[in-house]
Each structure stands twice: as C-alpha cells, then as structure tokens.
Amino acid sequence: MEFKHVLMILGVIILTLAPLIMYSGLGEDEGYFGGADGAAGDLIMEISPNYEPWFEPFWEPPSGEIESLLFALQAAIGAIIIGYFFGYNKAKYDAKNQ
C-alpha cells in the first residue's frame, strides 16, 4: 500500500474518532446536540416574551425517533439525487471525450 493511502486512512480514522473523544459522556444535558430550532425558540422568547408564531405545524412526528428517521430519509434522498447528477455528468463527459 502506498504511503499516501496509509495517510488517507489514518486521516479518516482520526477525523472519525476526534468528535467521539472530544464529546465522550457529554450530551443534551450540557446543551450539546441540542438543535437550532430549540435554541432559536428560546432566544425569541427571551427577546420578546409576547411573540406569537405566525403558524403551527400541521403535523408533528409522534416521537423523536420518527423525527430522526424522517430527517435521515430526507438526507438519503438528497444524497441519491446529488449522486445521480454527478454520475450523469461524469458519463456525459466520458462519452463526449471518447
């Protein structure tokens, strides 16, 4: 295996383990991974306690797990679409240059 491949593998391992080591044992109790929606809502209520939202969601997921599932599904669909267009453009480029 070439030296640059070994460096790349070590880089991936370090980038994977660094967040796990930095935040081990810390979680939502200390405010990590809290989410932007909750923080924004708290800040709005702090600035203007009489604020009333313009609208309410027509459906809220019954649990956090389903909310996470829908978020992951949305990310997967987006990745598939982006991957399709990268592959399509690569094939078009290869066909043009043959």
Swiss-Prot record:
What is a single cellular component term in the Gene Ontology annotation? plasma membrane
The residues that cross the membrane are 6-26, 68-88
Give one GO biological process term.
cobalamin biosynthetic process
Q: How does it sit in the membrane?
A: Multi-pass membrane protein
Pathway connected to this protein: Cofactor biosynthesis; adenosylcobalamin biosynthesis
Q: Which GO terms describe its molecular function?
A: cobalt ion transmembrane transporter activity
Q: Where in the cell is it found?
A: Cell membrane
UniProt keywords (A-Z) are:
Cell membrane, Cobalamin biosynthesis, Cobalt, Cobalt transport, Ion transport, Membrane, Transmembrane, Transmembrane helix, Transport
Record-linked InterPro entries = CbiN
Which parts of the chain are coiled coil? none
Its primary localisation, in coarse terms, equals: membrane
Q: Which HAMAP family match?
A: CbiN
Binding partners and assembly: Forms an energy-coupling factor (ECF) transporter complex composed of an ATP-binding protein (A component, CbiO), a transmembrane protein (T component, CbiQ) and 2 possible substrate-capture proteins (S components, CbiM and CbiN) of unknown stoichimetry.
Question: What this chain does, per the record?
Answer: Part of the energy-coupling factor (ECF) transporter complex CbiMNOQ involved in cobalt import.
Q: Protein name, please? A: Cobalt transport protein CbiN
Instruction: Give the source lineage, highest ranks first.
Output: Archaea, Methanobacteriati, Methanobacteriota, Methanomada group, Methanococci
Identify the coding gene: cbiN
